[in-house]
Amino acid sequence: MSKPTSSAMPQSNEEKFINHLMKNWKKSVARKIYADALKEIKKAGHMNPSVVVQAAIENASPNVMIKSKRIGWAVYQVPVEVKPAKRFFFATKWILDAARAKTWKPMSEKLAEELIAAYGNQWAAVKKKEEAHRMAEANKAFAYMAKYVN
């Protein structure tokens, strides 16, 4: 009986989040920012910071997105279901973009604020998700074309 092999080690969501947070290949800096953000969340009165992070990512992750499909001369905005890996990617991207857009604070504080806000279903990352869902709802008439979109 042979062992199943894999080319890459599976990563936890925490490691993926740190990789998305990383800039200029400085993973140690990203880990420190993430750890400081968890401490800030703990200071804010939340018992388990990792639960807050998971719930914030879940609240900010989209279920449906819009993809463009050209048929003839017309371009249709087709709503398609988002795969779990892409959901995580978009949620972390939107949370980090919202945190980076803020100014005059250390990144760990900005990240902690954004995670707490996404945990409570408010602020920028959740608004991006709601906007994506609104666009999908508006273009629901073209949902039958989803099987033609890659």
Predicted features by range, described:
Residues M1-N24, S28, A35-N150:
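Strongly charged
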